[in-house]
């Protein structure tokens, strides 16, 4: 097997992927990738890419040849320039059935870290609020991501931010514990620091990261609920 590896490295020459992230394409990158093939591992291609959108610069990440936002969405506009209505909890969020967004605990400081919370009506709106050429990730796209990271039972740990959700963030997904806004009249904003919940493009389905669990979970919720959003390139 060792001889086979040596022959493969010699025949391949220089790698086309910077597997060790040092900025150089060399034999070391080939060895890393060959070892990855033999051990059925995975790696993340980190690119120095950003998206300038609605007066904010988003970090992005490539995982399994798919371009994801590495931050939660925070836009307040649709692609045509229309405003997404911001509704505070005591202004009737529970009884609203129109597209809307919110700041957790009505705090712009929270939004600066965790992004906005959106209801499903905003996600479903035909005007779209991801950058042009991007869309809200579907449940199947989250599932494909999880499978690439080793399966839903362990993917959450690799997706979670190490500061806010006790994960390893090996994937560089940077999943944040942005909490949620419940649709019930008695509950309000909940679980910042413990839960990261992300609407999918599938109606009422969201992906969930939890601080004390390694899995990526999928659940359903009333469309009035407020959750984070991640965009993915078309």
Regions of interest found by a model, annotated:
Residues 43-234:
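Conserved positions within compact, well-structured domain cores
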Residues 12-13, 32, 129:
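Alpha-helical transmembrane segments and their juxtamembrane interfaces
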Residues 2-13:
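Sec-dependent N-terminal signal peptides
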Residues 6, 29-32, 122, 144:
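Hydrophobic side chains within alpha-helical segments
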Residues 19-43:
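Alpha-helical segments with a strong preference for the paired helices of cellulosomal dockerin domains
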């Amino acid at each position: 097997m060792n001889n086979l590896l040596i022959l493969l490295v010699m025949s391949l020459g220089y790698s086309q992927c910077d597997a060790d992230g040092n900025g150089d394409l060399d034999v070391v990158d080939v060895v890393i990738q060959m070892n990855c093939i033999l051990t059925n591992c995975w790696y993340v291609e980190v690119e120095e890419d950003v998206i300038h959108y609605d007066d904010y610069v988003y970090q992005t990440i490539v995982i399994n040849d798919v371009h994801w936002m590495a931050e939660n969405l925070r836009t307040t506009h649709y692609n045509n320039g229309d405003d997404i209505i911001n509704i505070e909890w005591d202004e009737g969020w529970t009884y609203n059935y129109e597209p809307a967004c919110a700041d957790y605990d009505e705090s712009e400081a929270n939004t600066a870290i965790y992004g906005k919370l959106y209801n499903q009506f905003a996600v479903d709106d035909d005007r779209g609020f991801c950058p042009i050429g991007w869309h809200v990730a579907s449940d199947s796209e989250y599932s494909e991501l999880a499978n690439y990271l080793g399966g839903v039972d362990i993917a959450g740990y690799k997706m979670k931010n190490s500061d806010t959700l006790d994960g390893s963030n090996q994937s560089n997904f940077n999943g944040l514990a942005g909490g949620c806004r419940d649709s019930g009249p008695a509950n309000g904003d909940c679980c910042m620091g413990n839960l990261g919940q992300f609407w999918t493009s599938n109606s009422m389905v969201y992906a969930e990261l939890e601080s004390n669990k390694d899995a990526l979970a999928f659940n359903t919720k009333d469309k009035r609920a407020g959750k984070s959003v991640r965009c993915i390139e078309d």
